[in-house]
Structure formats: structure tokens, C-alpha cells
Amino acid sequence: MIVTAIIHLKIKEEVKNKSKYMIAKQLIEPKSIVVVGGSDDIHKPGGTVLRNLQDGNFKGSLYVVNPKMDEVQGIKAYRDVKDLPEVDCAILAIAAKFCPSTVEVLAKQKNTKAFIILSAGFHEENEEGAKLERQIVETINSVGGSLIGPNCIGVLTNHYSGVFTSPIPELNPQGVDLISGSGATALFIMDSGMQKGIKFNSMYSVGNSAQLGVE
């Protein structure tokens, strides 16, 4: 028997006390998304999530940043985030050490308010990674933004498939919202639940829960 409950994204108390923070609309329903680290290789997170965004129901503007490519999966690739236009939501699939500076540019120069960091190598590994994570959270808080992750599989909603997994489960607007620290657990729950007739409206894999977590 699967027990379902109403679960809400919650700001970690230590974060809430330092910033006037609300969950950004750009995370729930972005009008533009950039995949930083997008790849032609669909076996890599940056390749899989880009393919899912294109194959899914995202209707907004989609951008890619890849320093070595002019085009990725048929989309013009920017060599540097500094060259991007303003963008609502950024999905990062790059090495952890590059994430703080990338977030800094997007948040401060590109008016980006929603961040989904797929990359691992943060506080789950060592203190150096924890420091990188804190830098990212501080930057995002300073602009009133939202962060999912790091170290997660992404976000799946009726507006966009920002996850690096396949196949993509079928969603239903009348279903429940699932939030999980573990992406693998979330997918297992969805698969098992759907077999029993449970419908899902969205899935948020919060990973390390550096800013947003589970209440």
C-alpha cells in the first residue's frame, strides 16, 4: 500500500532567516530555459535533459551553453553564459567548481531567478564542495531566486521536462506533486504508484536541498 501526503517545498530555516525569499515563478513556469553544459551525447546529464526539454511540452525559448560547440542538438550554442540573453531558468550540468561563477553571472547579469543544479561534488563529498554550495546559495538568495539541488535529477512538470532520466513518466494535472531528496526513489515511487492508479502532476528532485527542501 502506498500512502500519499501533501508535501510542500520549504525554505531551509537558516536560508529563510537571511533573505526575503519566495519560490520564484520562473521555477514553476519558466518562459525561457538555458542548459549550461548541454551536449549532443544523450548519455550525459546535459544531453539527456536537453533532449527531454525538446521532446517534452516546453513552449518557451531554449538556450544552450557549451564552450566547444556552435550547435547542440540543433540549437545554437553559446560559448559563455555572458553571451546569453536574459533567461528565467538555468539548468546546470557542469563540474561543481564552475557552478558558483556561472550562477553569479546568470543571477546578477541575466536576471535568472530559477536554478536547477544537476551536478554532484558539493557538500555530499567534502568541505570544499560544501563551500561551493554555500557560495551558490548566497548568490541566489541575493536576487530572491530559487534553487533545486545540487546533486539532483531535476524537475518534471506539465510545463517542462527538466530531468536527465528516461523514459519520462506521463503526468496528469489532477495528480499529486512529488518531492524527494533522492531522484531514484522519486522515480521508483512514481512507477509503483502509477501501476496502482496514482496520478502525478509534478516531480521535484531536491538532491542536497541546499536551499529548497521538504516540509
Where are these regions (language model features)?
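Catalytic-core regions of core metabolic enzymes
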Residues: 5-7, 11-215
